[in-house]
C-alpha cells in the first residue's frame, strides 16, 4: 500500500502524526505533508435499507 494511504488511514483511526512517524520510521513533519497531499477521500460504506410501505 502507498505510504500516503497508510498515513491517511492511520490518522483517521486516531493516531497522531508522531505515533505514525515512529511506526513508519519517518519524521512527523514528513508524515503531516504526506497526509495533507493525499487527495483521495475514502468513504465508509453505509448499508442503505430499502423502505417498502413505510416499514423497514
Curated annotation (Swiss-Prot):
Pfam family, one: DUF2774
Annotated organism of origin: Enterobacteria phage T4 (Bacteriophage T4)
InterPro entries hit by this protein: Phage_T4_Gp24.3
Annotated protein name in UniProt: Uncharacterized 6.6 kDa protein in Gp24-hoc intergenic region
Domain of life: Viruses
Amino acid at each position: 500500500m502507498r505510504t500516503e494511504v497508510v498515513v491517511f488511514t492511520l490518522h483517521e483511526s486516531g493516531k497522531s502524526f508522531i505515533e505514525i512517524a515512529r511506526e513508519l520510521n519517518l519524521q512527523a513533519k514528513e508524515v503531516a505533508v504526506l497526509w495533507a497531499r493525499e487527495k483521495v477521500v475514502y468513504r465508509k460504506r453505509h448499508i442503505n435499507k430499502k423502505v417498502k410501505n413505510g416499514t423497514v
